[in-house]
Amino acid sequence: MALTTDFAGIDPGTTTTEAKTDYSRYRIVPARHPGRAAGTIFAALVIAIVLYSTFTNPRWGWGVFAEWFFAEPVLVGLGRTLLLTALAAVSGSILGTALALARVSKSPLLASLSWGYIWLLRSIPMIVLLLVLNNLGYLYETISIGVPFTDKVLFDYPTTQLLTPFAAAFLGLTLNQSAFFAEIVRGGILSVDQGQLEAAASLGLSRRRQAFRIVLPQAMRSILPTGFNEIIGLAKSTSVVYVLALPELFYTVQVIYRRNLEVIPLLMVATVWYLVIMTVLSIAQHYIERYFSKGAVRNPTPLPFRAFFRRFHRPLPATADGRSDTGALAAFRSVTDLRAKGGAVRIHGISKSFGALKVLDDIELNLPAGSVTAIIGPSGSGKSTLLRAINHLERVDSGFISVDGELVGYTQRGEVLYELKEKDILKRRTDIGMVFQNFNLFPHLTVLENIIEAPIQVRGLDRDEAIVFARELLARVGLSDKIDAYPRQLSGGQQQRVAIARALALRPKVLLFDEPTSALDPELVGEVLDVIKELARTGTTLVIVTHEIGFAREVADSIVFMEGGHVIEAGSPTQILNDARHPRTRAFLAKVL
């Protein structure tokens, strides 16, 4: 039935007068906001009254203020305040970062030591800490460094001469600052998505590289606002060191107004200088936050002097054959570096439990080199856990996994298996690439930086060589024009294609796909599946967890059906999809086909 027949009395052939009206000639009257206007007038009146009262009252002593604002004693005190602030901010931030990393360490004793330090230093008032440090010479006459349990002394110096008032002030401010800054950094670290750590680990990046290249740059977006609050508070806290008779800005002002009795003008001298310091710090905070917001916004505002510094950037090396990509997907078969024999994966009776829930139960699988295996099954059947176990992101409770006869997570010496340390496991992971369900691209790095990070840091490739190969991979996934884009500026399908290119950059023997299309809109699924189809012809061993049954039929050599942590049935696509033997397999396929 035609849609127009459902609306009685409306003739679709007629055109109403309203539809013919040309609104472009109408004058637009902006919305009125009387409350906003009243608020603006009130704010202007308050500002005018305050300024008038301040600058017309002679008791403020602006003449005395002008006389002392640039006076030499004040500037010397200001310099000491700035020096203390800078030294304590830098050293406190470094020590605080180390304490934060210790707090999230897997060593219980190290984490407890860090917690105890933070608890103690946050509990002690600043003025008490400064006085204790200033009187440390009473407790320890000398500071000695020597060889433990021997009489050999390497360093010996009187405490009172070593711990001057300036040194005591610097040490006290640093210790106090580090305790508070440690919790700020820890909060920033915890704010970074766990998937970022898993992605970095799957690429084989070292723990140090994960921390300083992946986690901390992202954590800075959370750290900076509260961190700069602490630095601003530190600048003002330097006034507390007056208890050590150290002539910083506030102490110097106190000495002057006690002599000339001009209290208010001299206090205003200190106040305005503190305002100047805070203003400079606030401006610095603004630009530093903008720098670390890379990738967080789709259209970032260019930083000052960006054009100047870009002149010193090295141009990217061209690809070997000078090809350019027009956005069309090219065949991976033409990429020489990707035509390699995949690794054979053998899964020997692995089991895994999370508390009382057994997610994998005595799994046995043999995946030949160069094969394409699709794992299907209902949600919660253990499919993703199995993938994570293959590259040791999830440690199994029992059983073993090998790639080309080499055990994952262990090294064999005779008839003894030794569990590998984390750094050795990271090296093994370079042969097992993984593409995550939620992409897990590093948002603060460009597309190019995402791809070349692991080849340079893990494989030891020359940067130019890594860039050439990255550009080749991007051409193959149809994204050469996105080389300088950030992940947030890409669609979901584009992000997943970049994730595939990133995993391929390590030239792995085995490539794992964890539901690569589940986070995509239906319109974007096809472009990712096309890439995987081309990969299936390169010889790399592919293991794909998917709900795309039609895709599994087309690309897979074998299909594995899982439920409740068990492999219910495995076989060729024809056997599983057309002639499944197990009733549970048939029931599942009846719902999804």
PLM features: residue spans?
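Transmembrane alpha-helices and adjacent helix-loop boundaries
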Residues: 2-318, 579
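Conserved signature/switch motifs of ABC ATPase nucleotide-binding domains
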Residues: 485-488, 506, 538
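Catalytic Walker B motif of ABC-type/P-loop ATPase nucleotide-binding domains
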Residues: 511-514
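H-loop/switch region of ABC-family ATPase nucleotide-binding domains
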Residues: 546-547
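A short, surface-exposed alpha-helical micro-motif characterized by mixed small hydrophobic
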Residues: 552-554
